[in-house]
């Protein structure tokens, strides 16, 4: 759908550790929602693209795994385009634009991808 490598989203999900119904509240007042732990900062952009109110988008991200994963794919694709095709930078951006946090997250996702290939 978004021309992403097949293990990209499953590897991110393995690191995020989210699930249907999960909301993780952050110190900055935002929350991470559902299977892919999509941050509430994305509610506005997703609402504009999908043309649904933010509250409906939020409920769907929390309660509908397929919707959540599709949204995560769109987010990763956005970052991949922003990073001119650099998948590792895009994966790090999915978590944080702070360099140290970005790099640490990339390492975790690479490790998760390696585990997925050895199953």
Predicted feature residues:
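Catalytic glycan-binding domains that act on GlcNAc-containing polysaccharides
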Residues: 1-119
